[in-house]
Amino acid sequence: MIPLKTIEDLISKHSILEKELSSGEVDKKLFAEKSKEYSDLNEVIDDARKYFSYEGEKKDLEKILSDSNSDNEFKEMAEVELKDLKLENETIEKKLKLFLLPKDEADKKNAIIEIRAGTGGLEASLFAADLFKMYEKVSHQKKWELELISMSQSEAGGLKEVIASIRGKNIYSTLKYESGVHRVQRVPDTETQGRVHTSAATVAVLPEAEEVDIKINDSDLRIDVFRAGGPGGQSVNTTDSAVRITHIPTGLSVSQQDQKSQHKNKAKGMLILRSRLYELERSRIEGERSEDRKSKIGTGDRSERIRTYNFPQGRVTDHRINLTLHKLEAFLEGEAFDEMVENLTLQAQEEKLSNLN
C-alpha cells in the first residue's frame, strides 16, 4: 500500500504547479522544468485522486454490507461495486507505484551502440553484421537517426566491430536491454556437412553523455595522432588524421580514424570516451547498491549471455526472462523487436516494484 501522505503530496504538488504556471510569473529558467513536471503529474493525477478517496468509498460500501437493515438487492449491488472498486484500486496502485519509482535520467538520452564479433571466427563477424542491420532497421522504422562512428570490416561482408550513435526520443530506455552476449546457432554457408555452428557477438549500449554529465580534465587526457591505416596496414592517408585518446586515471582508450579530418576524429573519439566514462560512473554507483536489489535485467554486463538466435528452429530466446519468439526472421527485420523490449521492460518494472515493496 502507498502511504496516503505520499499521494496527498503528489496531489498538492500538481495543484501548486498548476497555479504557478497559470499565473505567468514562473522564472523563465524554470518554466520548461516545471512544465515537464506538471505534464508528468497530469498523467496520474486522476488516479491519485481516486486512490486517495478509495478508503472512504470502501468503508461506505462495507457499511452497507454489514448493515442488517439493508435489503438483499441493495447488498448485492454494493458487493459487486466493492469488488470492482478493489480491482480498479489494485490497477491504480500499480500504476502509481511505477510513477513513484526512481527515474533513470539516462533513459531519455541518445545512445552509443557498440557491436563486436566474439567467438566463432567468420561466422561471428557475419552475425555481428546481422545484428547491426537489425538495429539499423529498428532505427529506420522508429524514425531514429543512426550515425556511423566507426566500422572495422572482415571478409565476406562481416564486421569485426562497429560503433554508431542513435538519436531520437527515449533511445536509451528502448535499447539498454540489448547489452550483453548474443549467441547465434545456424549452418554456415561454408558448412558441407550441414552441421549447426554456434558463435557470438557482444553488444554494448551506452547512454550518450553530454559535457554536463561528466567532467573530464584536459590534464587527464593523453592524445596521440598517427596516420590512418587501411586493411593489412596499408596507409590510406598521408596526414596524421587518426587519433587515440587515453583517459589516464582509468586507462580507458579510444582510437578513431574513420574521418579524414583529425578534428572530426577527435570529436567522435571524445563522444565515445565521455559516454564510456559516464557509464563507468553509473556502474560504480549501481555496484554500491545491495546485491539483493540489483536487477537481473539491464545490468549491462557485457559478459552475460542474454539471447540466442536459433536459425534451424526459427526462434529467438531471451534467457533473462525465458521468453521465446518463434519469429526469428521478423525479429531480425525489426518487426518483432518491440514485443521483446516490452516484455523486458515489464519484467524490469516488476523487479523494481518487488524491491519497493
Swiss-Prot record:
Keyword Cytoplasm (UniProt): yes
Annotated signal peptide: none
InterPro entries given in the database record: PCRF, Pep_chain_release_fac_I, Pep_chain_release_fac_I_sf, Prokaryotic/Mito_RF, RF-1
Modification sites for N5-methylglutamine: Q234
PTM: Methylated by PrmC. Methylation increases the termination efficiency of RF1.
Compartment annotation: Cytoplasm
Annotated GO MF terms: translation release factor activity, codon specific
HAMAP family, alphabetized: Rel_fac_1
PANTHER family registered for this protein in UniProt: LD18447P
Function of the molecule: Peptide chain release factor 1 directs the termination of translation in response to the peptide chain termination codons UAG and UAA.
Family recorded in the similarity comment: Belongs to the prokaryotic/mitochondrial release factor family.
Protein name: Peptide chain release factor 1
Protein's organism: Pelagibacter ubique (strain HTCC1062)
